[in-house]
C-alpha cells in the first residue's frame, strides 16, 4: 500500500522509473517497520512486486518469492526469479523482502517492451505453486474457480493491455 501510494503521489514529473521503483520499495520498508512496531508491537515482513507501465514499456522490481509472468503470442514466460534459499528437508527461506530493516543496494529493476493484448500476471507463491500451468490457458475467472482451499495465501493480479 505504501509503495503504491508513493508512486501515485510522486510519478508526475519524475524522470526515472528505476529510481521511482527503488524509492517506493524503501518507502514500503519504512512503513512496514513503523506499522509493525506501533500497531502490533512486533517485527513484520512481506514479499512484494511492483511495476510501472508507460508507453508499452514495463519497469518492474520484486523482493522475495513473488512472480511476474508475461503472456503474449510467444506463450507464457516468467520475468522474475525467486529470492529464496533451499535450507533442506523441503524447506525454503526468503532471502529478500521488505521488513523494516533496510534493503540491499542491488535491488533488481528490469524493463520489458509490451504490445497490445499482452497479459501480465503478478502471483504470490501460494498461487504459482498450485496453478502456474493454468495461467497460459485460462482466464482469471477460471483460475479463481479452480482454487478452492489452498495451503497458503493466494493472490493473483492480471493486467491486460
Which residues does each PLM region occupy?
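PP2C/PPM-type serine/threonine phosphatase catalytic domain
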Residues: 1-161
